From Swiss-Prot:
This is Probable cytochrome P450 4e1. Heme binds at E307, C444. SUPFAM superfamilies: Cytochrome P450. PANTHER family: CYTOCHROME P450 4D1-RELATED (PTHR24291:SF203), CYTOCHROME P450 FAMILY 4 (PTHR24291). It comes from Drosophila melanogaster (Fruit fly). Keywords: Endoplasmic reticulum, Heme, Iron, Membrane, Metal-binding, Microsome, Monooxygenase, Oxidoreductase. The gene is Cyp4e1. Its cofactor is heme. PROSITE patterns: CYTOCHROME_P450.
């Protein structure tokens, strides 16, 4: 009995000793990096906070503490380096071998499988090469038609929710718009999310992204085996099956339509251009001389929908929120719409060419992405030792690239908390000092798609509405944003004490969101001020 009891009591000590000895080399190397002191077993997890917002604030606090440079931290026995140094960014993003994603992306595997976002090695290289033509200029023009159609429906929806000066959560509304756009462009089907919000498929998209975000910040729910015992697991399984069945059914129908068409002599390029979707491109593609399998089709379509939905919700949401707080910039954008489209042409859709000539709109979106990048962090995992800028980064380390921090670095951007779209005319940040869509061989393949959608939606909103803050008092009187991330700790604490309930509370997991929504008002425009 005593032997069993002693063994039971000694087990924790044995496990701690076992893990500590196994990490001696990695710890020794990483201790050369600045960072907070860690505890056995938990690392720095006890300092991180309990919510995505608290964790984000902790990261920025450490960033200030360690001179706005790289720092290391531990979550249990998982070693991490937060990368904010542009030299490190350049090495990592330019590397042809450092392309393995961090383990947080494993949370998407049950839904996305091993598509372009999560695959690595030869599969990633082959599929990247295969998918690149799907974002060719001509296909983007086709996608733009779909974006315009859904944006028109979105304007009608906004007229209803904004009626009578109503304060509403624009982030919530944008979620349904971008879901409609991505389903139309990815699979050539409309799920009418804006009108049918309670459908099982629409709700499933919302639920699964929330679950992934929740698991990312829960050590035990992050484990795929332990998550089976979580109270959320049964509902998650149901949600996952709903999405898998929906996507696979559409793929099967699309394959059948193509077979029927080809059997009677219809060529693939004779399908209506308007109906050509990302899925059609995949069905016409080959890898190693063969068509894609059903599983590969599922993985790439699901990945495209995931990456093209949540990120554009964030991009559109924060851009329109900034319109509400900065009326002077909104006026410049409205006048540009009049100049480009003509005083009598504001009611029609902007063409692909017109969108591309809206220079101030481009500057506005760049500045919005500097402050609120849709993807705040990118994770890479070192499968071998790397020497970066003279430092040895050991095998088994997660490199978290802090894209969000880059935008608030006053060494790169003067007066970073001031919203100044024209800064991108005056200041030319280095190629790895401003990377809202990543860079290098694993950059965002859908960057042009995302920017086109954001610009199309913002352009249409500006022409139809004057965007107002939730309350008049929330208009920025000096050009500064309400977000306090990146400020010196003392100034941040002082400013946070005066924050309004309608000021965004940022949270970051795989995409940037506002935990309390993006509340604003809209007033319909009647005429074009052609001055």
């Amino acid at each position: 009995m005593w032997i069993v009891l002693c063994a039971f009591l000694a087990l924790p000590l044995f496990l701690v000793t076992y893990f500590e000895l196994g990490l001696l080399r990695r710890k020794r190397m990483l201790n050369k990096f600045q960072g907070p002191s860690m505890l056995p077993l938990v690392g720095n997890a006890h300092q991180m906070g309990n919510t995505p917002t608290e964790i984000l604030n902790r990261f920025f606090g450490w960033w200030h503490e360690y001179g706005k440079d790289n720092f290391r931290y531990w979550i249990g026995y998982y070693s991490n380096i937060m990368v904010t140094n542009p030299k490190y960014m350049e090495f990592i993003l330019s590397s042809q071998t450092l392309i393995s994603k961090s383990d947080v992306y494993d949370l998407t595997h049950p839904w996305l499988g091993l598509g372009l976002l999560t695959s690595t090695g030869s599969k990633w290289h082959k599929h990247r090469k295969m998918i690149t033509p799907a974002f060719h200029f001509n296909i983007l023009q086709d996608f733009h038609e779909v974006m315009n159609e859904n944006s028109t429906k979105f304007i009608d929806q906004l007229k209803k929710v904004a009626d009578g000066g109503n304060i509403f959560d624009f982030q919530e509304e944008a979620h349904y718009l971008t879901l409609d756009v991505i389903c139309d462009t990815a699979m050539g089907v409309s799920i009418n999310a804006m009108e049918n919000r309670s459908s099982s498929v629409v709700q499933a998209f919302k639920d699964i992204t929330y679950t992934i975000k929740m698991r990312a910040f829960s050590p035990w729910k992050r484990n795929k085996y332990l998550f089976h015992f979580a109270p959320e697991y049964p509902e998650y399984s149901k949600t996952l099956k709903t999405l898998q069945d929906f996507t696979n059914e559409i793929i099967a129908k699309r394959i059948e339509v193509r077979k029927s068409g080809l059997e009677v002599g219809i060529k693939a390029d004779e399908f209506s251009r308007k109906k050509m979707a990302f899925l059609d491109t995949l069905l016409s593609s080959k890898v190693d001389g063969r068509p894609l399998t059903s599983q590969e089709l599922y993985e790439e379509v699901s990945t495209f929908m995931f990456e093209g939905h949540d990120t554009t919700t964030s991009g559109v949401g924060f851009a329109v929120y900034l319109l509400s707080r900065h009326p002077d910039e909104q006026e410049k954008l409205f006048n540009e719409q009049c100049d480009v489209m003509g005083a009598s042409g504001l009611g029609r859709d902007a063409t692909f060419q017109e969108i591309s000539t809206m220079k101030h709109l481009d500057l506005f979106i760049k500045e919005a992405q500097r402050l609120y990048p849709s993807v705040p962090f990118i994770g890479r995992f070192t499968e071998k030792d790397y020497v970066i800028d003279g430092d040895i980064v050991p095998k088994g380390t997660t490199l978290n690239l802090g894209l969000l921090m880059l935008g608030y670095n006053d060494r790169v951007f003067k007066d970073p908390h001031k919203f100044q779209p024209e800064r991108f005319d005056r200041e030319k940040p280095g190629p790895f000092e401003y990377v809202p869509f990543s860079a290098g061989p694993r950059n965002c393949i859908g960057q042009k798609f995302a920017l086109l959608e954001i610009k199309t939606v913002v352009s249409k909103i500006i022409r139809n509405f004057e965007v107002l803050p939730a309350l008049d008092e929330l208009v920025s009187k000096d050009g500064y944003i309400s977000t306090t991330l990146g400020l010196q700790p003392a100034e941040k604490k002082s400013r946070d004490a005066h924050n309004h309930k309608y000021d965004p509370i940022l949270s970051a997991s795989m995409t940037l969101k506002s935990e309390n929504g993006l509340h604003l008002r809209m007033k319909q425009r009647l005429v074009c001020d052609s001055t």
